[in-house]
């Protein structure tokens, strides 16, 4: 059995290591991540994780692990900002409000698919112009759903969360461990 991580995210690799799991291969899938018309955040996130898992080429006994993280402000999906201007708009919209961070995990082995979605609540403070401009200049927003990374500089902007911290980062470990175990992946092994 080979474990394939369908993600280029170094954060997901780091989180997997906390379970004593090292992927044998890293094969990020290339799928269309555009939301469908009228699609709500949670079904959107679950669909992307499943589509990513289906898109990774794997043998019948290989295990594919994929995830998708989405930031939702009400019914609005805030994906990865295209540029600093969009990141600024996201951060201003999130400021002073609670929002949801949804991470969907999909594990595939052969024709079997195991899935979970984890929804966490996050409150971001209103950012001053200095904070906003410094954060944008850091570049940390690039490639991050909602335009921020809670485990980085943006941690200073988050006074409150409810839910899974690792889910907000991008891979909810409790749920991921359950799914990997269901697929037969041994957990909690020390690195060789």
UniProtKB/Swiss-Prot annotation:
<dbReference type="GO" id="GO:0036221">
    <property type="term" value="F:UTP diphosphatase activity"/>
</dbReference>
<protein>
    <recommendedName>
        <fullName>dTTP/UTP pyrophosphatase</fullName>
        <ecNumber>3.6.1.9</ecNumber>
    </recommendedName>
</protein>
<dbReference type="GO" id="GO:0036218">
    <property type="term" value="F:dTTP diphosphatase activity"/>
</dbReference>
<keyword id="KW-0378">Hydrolase</keyword>
<comment type="similarity">
    <text>Belongs to the Maf family. YhdE subfamily.</text>
</comment>
<comment type="function">
    <text>Nucleoside triphosphate pyrophosphatase that hydrolyzes dTTP and UTP. May have a dual role in cell division arrest and in preventing the incorporation of modified nucleotides into cellular nucleic acids.</text>
</comment>
<feature type="site" description="Important for substrate specificity">
    <location>
        <position position="11"/>
    </location>
</feature>
<feature type="active site" description="Proton acceptor">
    <location>
        <position position="68"/>
    </location>
</feature>
<keyword id="KW-0546">Nucleotide metabolism</keyword>
<dbReference type="GO" id="GO:0005737">
    <property type="term" value="C:cytoplasm"/>
</dbReference>
<dbReference type="Pfam" id="PF02545">
    <property type="entry name" value="Maf"/>
</dbReference>
<dbReference type="GO" id="GO:0009117">
    <property type="term" value="P:nucleotide metabolic process"/>
</dbReference>
<dbReference type="InterPro" id="IPR029001">
    <property type="entry name" value="ITPase-like_fam"/>
</dbReference>
<feature type="site" description="Important for substrate specificity">
    <location>
        <position position="151"/>
    </location>
</feature>
<dbReference type="InterPro" id="IPR003697">
    <property type="entry name" value="Maf-like"/>
</dbReference>
<feature type="site" description="Important for substrate specificity">
    <location>
        <position position="69"/>
    </location>
</feature>
<keyword id="KW-0963">Cytoplasm</keyword>
């Amino acid at each position: 059995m080979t474990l394939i991580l369908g993600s280029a995210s170094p954060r997901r690799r780091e989180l997997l290591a906390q379970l004593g799991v090292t992927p044998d291969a890293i094969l990020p899938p290339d799928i269309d991540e555009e939301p469908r018309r009228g699609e709500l955040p949670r079904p959107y996130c679950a669909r992307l994780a499943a589509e990513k898992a289906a898109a990774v080429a794997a043998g019948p006994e290989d295990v594919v692990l994929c995830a998708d993280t989405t930031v939702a402000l009400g019914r609005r999906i805030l994906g990865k900002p295209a540029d600093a201007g969009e990141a600024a708009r996201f951060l201003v919209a999130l400021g002073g409000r609670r929002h949801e961070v949804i991470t969907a995990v999909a594990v595939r082995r052969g024709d079997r698919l195991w899935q979970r979605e984890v929804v966490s609540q996050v409150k971001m403070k209103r950012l001053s112009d200095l904070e906003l401009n410094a954060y944008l200049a850091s570049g940390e927003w690039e490639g991050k759903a909602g335009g921020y990374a809670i485990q980085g500089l943006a941690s200073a902007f988050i006074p409150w969360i409810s839910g899974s911290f690792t889910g907000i980062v991008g891979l909810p470990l409790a749920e991921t461990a359950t799914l990997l175990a269901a697929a037969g992946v041994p957990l909690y092994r020390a690195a060789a």
